[in-house]
């Protein structure tokens, strides 16, 4: 849980080596970067809102990570965290985002006209298409550190802005605390709503405090455009629909996001963004675009093929199970999405998914015929 600065001052009575966490069994980016020397150098610092080094690393201390999956192991508590603790964050960002340097500049492109194709992914294989991102509202602490009042103010602002959306984006807000248990579970099962706060990241970082206060979901009438409020980020914006028309999903995503940003600006609020890190979000893994473009895709043959992991890696894609992170693939259905977030524009990332998915389908069709796929294995993108 985030500590006040007075607690941080109290801890400074002990030498740094007495306060340094035991990271000997850890497999996360934070544990890889944080040395006793770096801890000693940064531990007395705090951001203007009072977020400390121990607040940054606590989630990664409490969750050592997975032997095969490298987790990040740290969070930001406000926009300034990435600057105040840059000696820790910069190497983590470089490691996590494929060598992204502290001097690199991020590019943004939310013009769906720049996407080539994507309206014709074969619906016999692609069951659904989805694009999501996060946004943080400047002037507020991020979820690991925000107070009840801040969280409620974010909810109020977001609901006011979203209620101005019209046309096929028009919809309404559903506060978590006014939903029945059954209604909540139905939305979770249908992949519309975030899960209950059982994830170690949410719990250890303090993001689940006061749950379900000021949390909720806004969606349009046909549930193809959704905004989660006050989960891991202030806002999570999602465009989704059944079938393989990623172009339509991305166009709705860009239009909705642009309208939301305009509505916030009309109330004199802007999203956290800078030229180096792009859009600022709670977890360093989501910096840049914050964008994950994914499809649920049926690959019963390719999914079992020994070359599948290597093909995905070369296409800069990643797979999850049918139910998302840490779940199994059911019936040969995988959730396949872009692996990158930072250093590529939104259009570039969606393009990688569109082009990559077409190749995966071609490979699956070859395997259905009992033919080899060696000649289709791509070079590293």
Swiss-Prot record:
Protein name: Creatine kinase B-type
UniProt-annotated location(s): Cytoplasm, Cytosol; Mitochondrion; Cell membrane
Keyword Cytoplasm listed: yes
UniProt GO molecular function: ATP binding; creatine kinase activity
Domain notes: The internal MTS-like signal (iMTS-L) mediates targeting to mitochondria thermogenic fat cells.
Encoding gene per record: CKB
Residues bearing the modification Phosphotyrosine: 125
Residue(s) of cross-link: Glycyl lysine isopeptide (Lys-Gly) (interchain with G-Cter in ubiquitin): 45, 101, 107, 381
Record's catalysed reaction(s): creatine + ATP = N-phosphocreatine + ADP + H(+)
EC number: 2.7.3.2
GO-annotated cellular components: cytosol; extracellular space; mitochondrion; plasma membrane
Record PTM Phosphoserine, positions in chain: 4, 199
Subunit structure: Dimer of identical or non-identical chains, which can be either B (brain type) or M (muscle type). With MM being the major form in skeletal muscle and myocardium, MB existing in myocardium, and BB existing in many tissues, especially brain. Interacts with SLC12A6 (via C-terminus); the interaction may be required for SLC12A6 potassium-chloride cotransport activity.
Species the sequence originates in: Sus scrofa (Pig)
Stated role: Reversibly catalyzes the transfer of phosphate between ATP and various phosphogens (e.g. creatine phosphate). Creatine kinase isoenzymes play a central role in energy transduction in tissues with large, fluctuating energy demands, such as skeletal muscle, heart, brain and spermatozoa. Acts as a key regulator of adaptive thermogenesis as part of the futile creatine cycle: localizes to the mitochondria of thermogenic fat cells and acts by mediating phosphorylation of creatine to initiate a futile cycle of creatine phosphorylation and dephosphorylation.
Binding site for ATP: 128-132, 191, 236, 292-296, 320-325, 335
UniProt-annotated stretches for the region Disordered: 96-123
Modification 3'-nitrotyrosine, positions: 269
Boundaries of every Phosphagen kinase N-terminal domain copy: 11-98
Region spans: Internal MTS-like signal: 130-138
Record note on modification: Ubiquitinated by the ECS(ASB9) complex, leading to its degradation by the proteasome.
Keywords: ATP-binding, Cell membrane, Cytoplasm, Isopeptide bond, Kinase, Membrane, Mitochondrion, Nitration, Nucleotide-binding, Phosphoprotein, Transferase, Ubl conjugation
């Amino acid at each position: 849980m985030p500590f006040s600065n007075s607690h941080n001052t109290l801890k400074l009575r002990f030498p740094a080596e007495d306060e340094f966490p035991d990271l000997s069994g850890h497999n996360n980016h934070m544990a890889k970067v944080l040395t006793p020397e770096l801890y000693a150098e940064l531990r007395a610092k705090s951001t203007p809102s009072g977020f400390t080094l121990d607040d940054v690393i606590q989630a990664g201390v409490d969750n050592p990570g997975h032997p095969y999956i490298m987790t990040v192991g740290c969070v930001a508590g406000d926009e300034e965290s990435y600057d105040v603790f840059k000696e820790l964050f910069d190497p983590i960002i470089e490691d996590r985002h494929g060598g992204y340097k502290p001097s690199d500049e991020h590019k943004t492109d939310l013009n769906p006209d720049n996407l080539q194709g994507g309206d014709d992914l074969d619906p016999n294989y692609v069951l659904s298409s989805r694009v999501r991102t996060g946004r943080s509202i400047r002037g507020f602490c991020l979820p690991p550190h925000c107070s009840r009042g801040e969280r409620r103010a974010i909810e109020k602002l977001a609901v006011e802005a979203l209620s101005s959306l019209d046309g096929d984006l028009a919809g309404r807000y559903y506060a978590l605390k006014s939903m029945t248990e059954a209604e909540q579970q139905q939305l979770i099962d249908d992949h519309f709503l975030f899960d209950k706060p059982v994830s170690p990241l949410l719990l250890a970082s303090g993001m689940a405090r006061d749950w379900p206060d000021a949390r909720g979901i806004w969606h349009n009438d046909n549930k193809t455009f959704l905004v989660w409020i006050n989960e891991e980020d202030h806002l999570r914006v999602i465009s989704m629909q059944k079938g393989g028309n990623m172009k339509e999903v991305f166009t709705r995503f860009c239009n909705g996001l642009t309208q939301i940003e305009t509505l916030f600006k009309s109330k004199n609020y802007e999203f956290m963004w800078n030229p180096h890190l792009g859009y600022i979000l709670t977890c360093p893994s989501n910096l840049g675009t914050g964008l994950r473009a994914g499809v649920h895709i049926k690959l019963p043959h390719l999914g079992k093929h020994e070359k599948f992991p290597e093909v995905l890696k070369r296409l800069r894609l990643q797979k999850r199970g049918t139910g998302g992170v840490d779940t199994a693939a059911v019936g040969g259905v995988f959730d396949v999405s872009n692996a990158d977030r930072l250093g590529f524009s939104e259009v570039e990332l969606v393009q990688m998914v569109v082009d990559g998915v077409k190749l995966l389908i071609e490979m699956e069709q070859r395997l259905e015929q009992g033919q080899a796929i060696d000649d289709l294995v791509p070079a590293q993108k």
